Amino acid sequence: MADFDMVLKCWGLVEADYATYGSLVLTRLFTEHPETLKLFPKFAGIAHGDLAGDAGVSAHGATVLNKLGDLLKARGGHAALLKPLSSSHATKHKIPIINFKLIAEVIGKVMEEKAGLDAAGQTALRNVMAVIIADMEADYKELGFTE
């Protein structure tokens, strides 16, 4: 619980502007891990230099962060929230678990730079994301999705 609380201390800034933070997160994900862009077919035709200003990228990033905010606020009691996300990402979108680890790293970097998440907060975020991703991986296995 302490890890969730530590991350939530900085979450208000993110929550106040999901679109901007979402754009920063996805643009950085696509820059640092270009292979992840292929997992988002709707962004395939967008030039790399135009990703940051694209409304669709921003909107999807906002959705990602909004869902993450819900998971954080559940403070570990996230099974009912996570199950449908796991299901859609395993069965419909076919997103390998490693990609959640990559975006978690990027979220941490963006929160450090833009929302004041300090070293202890970074550790807390890594701990929280490890729990969420492990639970998601268990859901994936239950659904028979292996990468």
Swiss-Prot record:
Residues 2-141 form the Globin domain. Its main location: cytoplasm. GO terms for cellular component: extracellular exosome; sarcoplasm. Nitrite binds at H60. GO terms for biological process: removal of superoxide radicals. It is an enzyme of class 1 (oxidoreductase). The keyword DNA-binding does not apply. It is found in: Cytoplasm, Sarcoplasm. The keyword Metal-binding applies. GO terms for molecular function: heme binding; metal ion binding; nitrite reductase activity; oxygen binding; oxygen carrier activity; peroxidase activity. PROSITE patterns: GLOBIN. It catalyses: Fe(III)-heme b-[protein] + nitric oxide + H2O = Fe(II)-heme b-[protein] + nitrite + 2 H(+); H2O2 + AH2 = A + 2 H2O. Heme b binds at H89. Monomeric heme protein which primary function is to store oxygen and facilitate its diffusion within muscle tissues. Reversibly binds oxygen through a pentacoordinated heme iron and enables its timely and efficient release as needed during periods of heightened demand. Depending on the oxidative conditions of tissues and cells, and in addition to its ability to bind oxygen, it also has a nitrite reductase activity whereby it regulates the production of bioactive nitric oxide. This is Myoglobin. It comes from Pseudochaenichthys georgianus (South Georgia icefish). The gene is mb.
